[in-house]
Amino acid sequence: MASNFKKTTMASSAQRKRMSPKPELTEDQKQEIREAFDLFDADGTGTIDIKELKVAMRALGFEPKKEEIKKMISEIDKEGTGKMNFSDFLTVMTQKMSEKDTKEEILKAFKLFDDDETGKISFKNLKRVAKELGENLTDEELQEMIDEADRDGDGEVNEQEFLRIMKKTSLY
């Protein structure tokens, strides 16, 4: 029952996201990605060295972890050429940019819950949102939701805990 609430609180924005299955970038974003790619395609061959993926991503404001880079490389460089073309790079960066947007959306939702600006969602915050949404949940059900998301045991849900639980419920 408690998980139904989580699903309904974010359902409308989750449904909007599902309607466009492939993330779209603005022309400016595509141009920015092209410029970063061209910077590393110094010899003009239309490919960049796969080892430069991390540096190229950093140039676009991302801080990829080593494991994340390894996974991307294994998906892109299936033939083991050590090279990546612009199309592959654009695909990777489109995915990364849409993930960034998702995180921003989740944090906006967090701020709606955290109306007293404590940096945490309290039982009181959750109860208010449930009431505003017309959800008839018992105090026990609301407390179960807090308990499920609360990792540090302080009885409230901070931004990281909220991000984790929202990603876990696959609404984003």
Swiss-Prot record:
Residues 1-14 have a biased composition (Polar residues). Residues 1-31 are annotated as: Disordered. SMART domains: EFh. It is found in: Cytoplasm, Cytoskeleton, Microtubule organizing center, Centrosome; Cytoplasm, Cytoskeleton, Microtubule organizing center, Centrosome, Centriole; Nucleus; Nucleus envelope. The modification N-acetylalanine is found at residue 2. CDD domains: EFh. Keywords: Acetylation, Calcium, Cell cycle, Cell division, Cytoplasm, Cytoskeleton, DNA damage, DNA repair, Isopeptide bond, Metal-binding, Mitosis, mRNA transport, Nuclear pore complex, Nucleus, Phosphoprotein, Protein transport, Repeat, Translocation, Transport, Ubl conjugation. Ubiquitously expressed in all adult tissues tested, with strongest expression in brain, spleen, kidney, small intestine and ovary. Also expressed in the NIH 3T3 fibroblast cell line and peripheral blood lymphocytes. Signal peptide: none annotated. It comes from the Eukaryota. Pfam families: EF-hand_7. Ca(2+) 2 binds at residues 150, 152, 154, 156, 161. There is a cross-link at residue 22 (Glycyl lysine isopeptide (Lys-Gly) (interchain with G-Cter in SUMO2)). Residues 2-25 are annotated as: Required for self-assembly. One of its GO terms (cellular component) is glial cell projection. Binds two moles of calcium per mole of protein. This is Centrin-2.
